[in-house]
């Protein structure tokens, strides 16, 4: 299965009539493996900030999480495993695997829990597969 198929079929899947606004799979080096058409362009320093927060949980909390220039307030995630952010009525979930970051962005009416489930389920699967 191609990386794009993971984005299209697993991250952008229909959950109770809702789906993510945008999604991507990105390497730890910032290279985009696959993304939805409307996923914002990541800046190298944004990916570096995510990786640093996974290595040193809490580093993004004071400044916020930036994705494509959009700032998200960091909310409780799982230190070293999942970063969660909130912006207005939407938000973001980022799951770290051994080689990649699984990123899902949502807006209402999708809920944070639905976003978390979609992103973390694929992340857990990729970890099991050695990615």
UniProtKB/Swiss-Prot annotation:
Q: Tell me the keywords, alphabetical order.
A: Actin-binding, Allergen, Cytoplasm, Cytoskeleton, Disulfide bond, Phosphoprotein
Protein name per the record: Profilin-5
Keyword Nucleotidyltransferase listed? The answer is no
Cellular component per GO?
cell cortex; cytoskeleton
Q: Which residues carry this modification: Phosphothreonine?
A: 111
Q: What is known to happen upon mutating residue 6 to Q?
A: Decreased affinity for poly-(L-proline) (PLP)
The organism's place on the tree of life at top rank:
Eukaryota
Spell out the subunit comment.
Multimer. Occurs in many kinds of cells as a complex with monomeric actin in a 1:1 ratio.
Its function, per the record, reads: Binds to actin and affects the structure of the cytoskeleton. At high concentrations, profilin prevents the polymerization of actin, whereas it enhances it at low concentrations. By binding to PIP2, it inhibits the formation of IP3 and DG. Has a high affinity for poly-proline.
Stored Pfam families: Profilin (PF00235)
Q: Which SMART domains match?
A: PROF
Please tell me, according to the UniProt entry, what happens when changing residue 6 to F: Increased affinity for poly-(L-proline) (PLP)
The disulfide bonds in this chain are 13-115
Q: What is the first-listed, main subcellular location in coarse terms?
A: cytoplasm
Q: What protein family does this chain belong to?
A: Belongs to the profilin family.
What's the PTM story here?
Phosphorylated by MAP kinases.
The protein's location, in the record's own words, is: Cytoplasm, Cytoskeleton
